[in-house]
Regions:
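Metallo-beta-lactamase
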Residues: 209-268
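Pre-active-site segment of Zn-dependent metallo-hydrolases
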Residues: 28-111, 191-212, 237-251
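Binuclear metal-ion centers of metallo-dependent hydrolases, dominated by the metallo-beta-lactamase
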Residues: 111-176, 271-340
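Active-site beta-strand termini and strand-to-loop segments that position acidic
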Residues: 42-45, 174-176, 223-227
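N-terminal signal peptide c-region/cleavage motif recognized by signal peptidases
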Residues: 11-13
């Protein structure tokens, strides 16, 4: 009888699907954190797959690492996030200076959304801009994402647009799976779009006065996954008070993907955000604008190393390309947790 109970228990545990969120950075050089690395895929336990900031470190829609994508997120319209360029090939060029080719006029985000029938979830002006790119690729209008009871259900029949105002949210689920909530939150940055992605007429108007076109407000995201993980994706940003009041106090985030990027955030400021404002259980460091690693280990004398030395009381992992980490509902890394 005891053996029968054990067998039943084992069978039951084997039938329960994994309850971890899988996080996979897609960079330019396998196993490294390099200067142009931006893209990250988040896979909910339900199977819903979200691509965040495709940028320039993917090879466009044909990148074999992408797999199924249900939702495309873009934090702001800078070329390294919306994707005015794309990676020529995995490992092309150096980690500091990868070899890129143009992704104009479509952008990597537009290409991928069109090819994967993905929902564009972002602030309205940028969602509409990318919806037009998808329309050009598909040769038909990009519809609004269908909803029932304020919930979008993937997979979608075609790429669709789901614009969100700052502070608003979209709820998405895969089939009959549990829902994932995606909230658009502030960032302290700008959101100017590369002229290469604009029409010739628009470029001429802007070039005459050397001005830029901004596609709405720059943002970050808070994603509440079905296992309880609450992830804060900062986007490009400086420090601001809502990191504590909104992200920590209200959303109670327990995981943070932090963009370092010295034009917006230096190591001491970034460490203060982590240690004193947001206080997540775990940090994933990305967008470092330097070849930060060699053999997957952080190089001394880098801004990345400076930041790591200042963070206290929680693990920081590097967004090493192709290395999947798994996070439980509390924000703890439980698999693929390589030390920097």
């Amino acid at each position: 009888m005891r053996y029968l109970f054990l067998l039943c228990a084992l069978a039951t545990s084997a039938a329960v699907p994994a309850q971890n969120v899988k996080v996979t950075p897609l960079g330019t050089h396998p196993g490294e954190l390099c200067s142009r690395d931006r893209a990250t895929i988040f896979e909910d336990p339900s199977g819903l797959r979200i691509l965040y900031d495709a940028g320039q470190s993917v090879q466009g829609a044909d990148d074999p690492r992408l797999g199924t994508i249900h939702v495309v997120l873009v934090s702001h319209a800078h070329g390294d996030h919306i994707g005015d360029m794309k990676l020529k090939a995995q490992g092309a060029g150096s980690c500091d200076n990868p070899e890129l080719v143009t992704a104009a006029p479509a952008s990597t985000s537009g290409e991928i959304a069109a090819a994967k029938n993905a929902a564009l979830v972002m602030v309205g002006p940028m969602a509409n801009f990318l919806a037009k790119k998808v329309e050009t690729i598909n040769r038909k209008a990009t519809p609004n994402c269908p909803q029932a009871n304020d919930t979008m259900t993937a997979p979608f029949a075609a790429s669709c647009v789901a614009g969100v105002n700052l502070g608003g949210a979209r709820v998405v689920k895969l089939g009959d799976g549990k829902a994932v909530e995606i909230t658009v939150v502030p960032a302290s940055h700008d959101s100017t779009v590369p002229r290469a992605l604009l029409s010739e007429e628009e470029r001429k108007h802007l070039e005459a006065d050397n001005v830029s076109l901004q596609l709405g407000q720059p943002t970050g995201y808070v994603i509440r996954f079905s296992n309880g993980l609450v992830a804060y994706l900062t986007g490009d940003t400086g420090m601001f008070a809502e990191m504590k009041t909104t992200m920590a106090d209200f959303h109670k985030v327990n995981f943070m993907e932090l963009n370092l990027g010295y034009s917006a955030l230096n190591a001491p400021a970034a460490a203060h955000i982590v240690n004193d404002l947001v206080k997540p259980a775990t940090v994933l460091l990305s967008h470092v604008n330097e070849g930060a690693t060699s053999g997957g280990k952080v190089k001394s004398g880098t801004h990345t190393a400076d930041f790591l030395a200042l963070v206290k009381g929680r693990p920081v992992y590097l967004a090493l390309s192709g290395r999947t980490m798994e996070l439980d509902g509390s924000g703890k890394c439980v698999a693929g947790c390589a030390a920097p």
